[in-house]
């Protein structure tokens, strides 16, 4: 691909993005969560700079957003927005443009560089519900030795774009969304700032989500947070597996290019926001399928009744507990309840609702063999609502399924067992904004 001039692939680094540990296991490895020198927007410009993650837009949507708000970080995160559509999204000049724009914005005062190593508190409020995390840098080695746990496979072709972006800009710009089991010591420090200190940013985005940021620079608080995280033995990637894998690969590439590295260099760490598990909100991730796989509705209902209790419903069905599903087709909603034996003897993955639906209905009845690649299935994030399921089933698709959300405990269980979540299992809201925090490497 040309971005690994010293033979990165020769190091066998693709093996770090899998289930195998690449560092010998050690006893009682503790998380290293470090404060960092942050590059961030000038206070009065933060609301204009902050942008949704690069991967929620297609090229045209990204271009329209940058035209609407020229300061949007998308112009750097998706630098192809600065070019005609004839220019390849992944052309070398696109990444070079991202680097130039970041440097230009720093020179012009759009971004400032803090002088001290700090942590930051990042609070997002959606529908009146706050979610408060800590912005910090996590360790490449913690990722490799599984202190930071994964629950998704990554595809190398999807990593290449972010590897090139980070390496060219020498900056990590999209934070990785991490989760940990709530800790009272960390909670108390964070709560004291939220309750008593003035935020450095406080704005509401056009989508109605409020964003507030506080800076933690007092040495005693910085030291206390650092020590508290050393008592936390497991941290989990909630969202951003490809960004995390890309940041790690750039770090390993830089290590190869700097054989005398000490481990203290910034490329050994990656930008993260860490949230306590009890503040996270996972929404349903719903399914819609193109046809009934050659069956009539009567045949289909009869066949699925072997494994599910099927009941007609009066209106929309939003499942209220694990093991239940909504189903909509031909203008009618149904309530499905998986029979108890479907969960017997299953591991953390097999007992997930998304697995039960796939293993006992989507696969054997509707013929969806691999949901990652099958063109007959589509996935609809819960943020779009149940009406979107009706709309799709009444137009380009045939049948839709509403899911009960995967719980954060289920996600932790899968990661702890070093298993992989099925595709499209979790939909996190609200989305972290890019451009508010930049970590230069």
Predicted regions and their residues:
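Short, positively charged and aromatic/hydrophobic N-terminal segments
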Residues: 3, 16-22, 26-29
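Short hydrophobic alpha-helical segments enriched in small aliphatic residues
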Residues: 7-10
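Surface-exposed, charge/polar-rich loops and edge strands
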Residues: 27-441
């Amino acid at each position: 691909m040309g971005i690994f001039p010293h033979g990165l692939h020769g190091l066998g680094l693709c093996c770090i993005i899998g289930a195998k540990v690449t560092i010998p296991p050690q006893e009682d490895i503790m998380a290293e969560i470090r404060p960092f020198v942050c590059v961030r927007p000038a206070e009065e410009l933060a609301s204009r700079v902050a942008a949704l993650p690069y991967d929620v837009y297609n090229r045209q949507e990204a271009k329209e957003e940058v035209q609407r708000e020229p300061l949007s970080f998308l112009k750097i995160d998706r630098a192809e927005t600065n070019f005609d559509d004839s220019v390849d999204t992944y052309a070398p000049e696109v990444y070079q443009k991202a680097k130039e724009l970041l440097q230009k914005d720093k020179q012009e005062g759009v971004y400032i560089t803090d002088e001290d190593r700090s942590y930051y508190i990042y609070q997002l409020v959606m529908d009146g519900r706050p979610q408060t995390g800590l912005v910090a840098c996590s360790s490449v080695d913690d990722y490799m030795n599984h202190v930071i746990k994964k629950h998704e496979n990554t595809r190398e072709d999807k990593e290449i774009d972010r590897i090139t972006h980070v390496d060219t800009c020498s900056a990590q710009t999209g934070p990785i969304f991490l989760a940990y089991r709530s800790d009272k010591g960390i909670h108390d420090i964070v709560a004291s700032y939220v309750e008593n200190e003035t935020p450095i940013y406080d704005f509401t985005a056009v989508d109605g989500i409020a964003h507030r940021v506080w800076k933690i620079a007092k040495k005693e608080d910085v030291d206390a947070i650092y020590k508290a995280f050393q008592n936390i033995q497991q941290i989990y990637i909630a969202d951003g597996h490809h960004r995390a894998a890309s940041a790690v690969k750039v770090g390993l590439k830089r290590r190869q290019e700097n054989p005398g590295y000490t481990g203290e260099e910034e490329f050994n760490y990656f930008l993260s926001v860490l949230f306590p598990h009890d503040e996270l909100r996972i929404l349903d991730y719903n399914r819609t399928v193109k046809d009934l796989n050659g069956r009539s509705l009567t045949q289909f209902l009869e066949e699925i009744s072997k494994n599910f209790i099927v009941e007609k419903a009066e209106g929309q069905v939003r499942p209220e507990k694990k093991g239940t599903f909504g189903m909509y087709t031909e203008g009618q909603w149904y309530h499905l309840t998986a029979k108890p034996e479907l969960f017997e003897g299953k591991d953390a993955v097999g007992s997930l609702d998304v697995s039960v639906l796939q293993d006992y209905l989507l696969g054997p009845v509707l013929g969806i063999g691999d949901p990652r690649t099958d063109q007959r299935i589509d996935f609809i994030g819960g943020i779009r609502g149940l009406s979107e399921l009706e709309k799709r089933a009444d137009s380009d698709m045939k049948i839709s399924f509403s899911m009960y959300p995967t719980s954060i405990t289920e996600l932790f269980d899968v990661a702890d067992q070093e298993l992989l979540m099925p595709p499209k299992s979790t939909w996190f809201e609200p989305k972290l904004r890019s451009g508010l925090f930049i970590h230069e490497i």
